[in-house]
């Protein structure tokens, strides 16, 4: 019996192929280094995607609902851009308000020594390494901390509401897993990553105004 793959579940045919390639590289150990996280050192989580208008702001918003201090950036974005309308709508339907979000371009100077940097695709790792980022707590792929492992989370920008919901649903699972790991390494749960909330807000404002 033939196995039918719903490629839209991954964001389309090209996205599915990117997913397969990332899975193979992960299985070969190419991303073993991104599992070396100092969880007890984490004081803030920096989510990084491509444009900082869909995935990373949603992840940041969801993380803050868990009491996690979080900030988000884009590898290629225009500082001050609002969240994508489709992201805004689909996030709102899931209880995350992105109406006040303004995009900020990623720069290593904005990463603090105790930040955990979480990205959505292997190509984001390439750019972060190119910039010489040294995040004390670690740099990792958001989708490798649950099963099945998903080293590549396709950008929902320009795609259907169905895929937006699929993507955001997966991010919810990743943030749940993140919250549990942080709670295991900090007592009381989440306290250690909530202390720099004002610093996060200040960093966002400064990044958006540059």
How would you label these PLM feature ranges?
Residues 1-4, 76-78:
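Short, compositionally biased "basic patch" segments
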Residues 123-125:
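Alpha-helix capping/helix-boundary segments
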Residues 53, 163, 170, 202-203:
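A generic structural signal for solvent-exposed, polar alpha-helical segments
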Residues 119-120:
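Short beta-strand scaffold positions
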């Amino acid at each position: 019996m033939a196995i039918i793959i719903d490629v839209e579940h991954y964001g389309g045919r090209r996205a599915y192929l990117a997913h397969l390639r990332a899975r193979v590289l992960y299985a070969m150990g190419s991303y073993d280094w991104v599992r070396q996280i100092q969880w007890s050192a984490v004081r803030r989580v920096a989510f990084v995607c491509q444009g900082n208008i869909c995935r990373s702001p949603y992840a940041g918003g969801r993380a803050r609902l868990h009491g996690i201090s979080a900030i988000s950036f884009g590898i290629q974005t225009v500082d001050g851009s609002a969240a994508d309308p489709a992201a805004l709508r689909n996030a709102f339907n899931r209880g995350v308000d992105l109406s006040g979000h303004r995009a900020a371009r990623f720069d290593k100077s904005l990463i603090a020594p105790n930040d955990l940097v979480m990205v959505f695709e292997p190509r984001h790792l390439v750019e972060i390494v190119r910039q010489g980022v040294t995040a004390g707590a670690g740099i990792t792929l958001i989708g490798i901390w649950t099963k099945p492992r998903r080293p590549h989370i396709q950008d929902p920008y320009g795609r259907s509401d169905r895929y937006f919901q699929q993507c955001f649903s997966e991010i919810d699972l990743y943030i749940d897993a993140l919250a549990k790991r942080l709670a295991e390494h900090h007592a009381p749960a989440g306290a250690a990553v909530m202390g720099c909330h004002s610093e996060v807000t200040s960093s966002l404002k400064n990044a958006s105004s540059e």
